[in-house]
């Protein structure tokens, strides 16, 4: 029997959480990939992830602002990220 089928819910959630954090790290290491390109190619972007994060928090009775959700997804305050990404794009 497959390990995934017999895995308890806690381990499954732990793996999903670790995978999500790895996705965020992957995106963070590729700041040059613009949200519009992600949206065109994958149908979602960093802003979508932050909105989904906020929506899931709300379902669980946790109030997270747009800026707080974006800070979690972007790994820094959103305005700081926008400034850095504009510098990266100009450099490229």
PLM feature segments, named:
Residues 2-92:
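Domain-level signature for proteins that mediate thiol-based redox and metal-cofactor handling
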């Amino acid at each position: 029997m497959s390990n995934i089928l017999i895995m308890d819910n806690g381990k499954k959630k732990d793996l999903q959480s670790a995978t999500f954090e790895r996705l965020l790290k992957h995106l963070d290491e590729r700041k040059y990939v613009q949200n519009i390109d992600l949206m065109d190619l994958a149908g979602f972007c960093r802003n979508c992830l932050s909105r989904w994060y906020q929506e899931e928090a709300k379902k669980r009775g946790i109030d997270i602002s747009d800026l707080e959700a974006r800070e979690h997804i972007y790994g820094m305050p959103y305005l700081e990220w926008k400034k850095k990404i504009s510098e990266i794009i100009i450099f490229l």
